[in-house]
Amino acid sequence: MKIVSFSLEQGNKYFGDIDKDRFFIGKSVPYLRNKGLINNTGTPGQKYDRNDFRPAFGFWADFIHPTAMAEGALYHTLNTYDGAHFTFSFLQFAAHVPNGDFVRYFRELLKLPLAAQYFPDLALHNNRISLITGAVPVSLESDSSTTDLMEYLNPSIKSIESTEVIQAAKFIHWVQNDPQHRQTQIEIGITIFKEKMVEYARRYGLDGVADTICLVIADIRHQGRASSAEIQTALRSSKPLDNLLDIGKSRFPHRIDVLRQEIGVLTKAGTLGVRKYSAAKNDFV
């Protein structure tokens, strides 16, 4: 079992220690009336690199790249200060959505060999993340709620508790030291983007539409920064890509700048701008 110790240093920075390995957990930040942890710093080797995953996932490894960069791209990207209570991964999977990306990700993590080392009190029971407190496992999530899971990870977003720091430390140390954990992040991220493209193609009429336009729509929906009506209005315009990229630029200027930059680089390289989405194949051709 992995034992976590941690210290608060320099006023607002938390550092952890597992197996005599010291690492940065995150820094304390205020958010509206909340308070939590953020970790968005790391080395290039701790970031998603599409080249590493193209052999296994093909163009989809490139397709998610701009969104990954906009989300920070670090496998240990963390925030615990907003309504999701706990957000983690290179695509910032959020714990507040029932059967959502974080829940699906955590379920898969609990199947890995090291799961019992990091979370000995959890197990999958009927494919639900469950707390093992006695003879009967107690599910922490359902089709309608993840409240118990959020509280398990981070009891309150009003202050920083030891539980929150320890759970964050486990996720960070695990992903930094286990290639299978990182692979799981990628598999879940790409699987969900592929599934969502089926929905988006149907809702927005994206069969035969350019990869760049599909990518921006997927990013908008991933972040949740616009309604379907706004997306449809941009799609009907004379410059759909530009108008889609303009959505949310006043509220999220950095994210939009990153998207524009990464799409531009990949387009110039001939990676983007040459494929269209095929609804029949659920793939870009």
Predicted regions span which residues?
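Cell-wall polysaccharide-cleaving catalytic domain and substrate-binding groove, primarily
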Residues: 1-208, 212-285
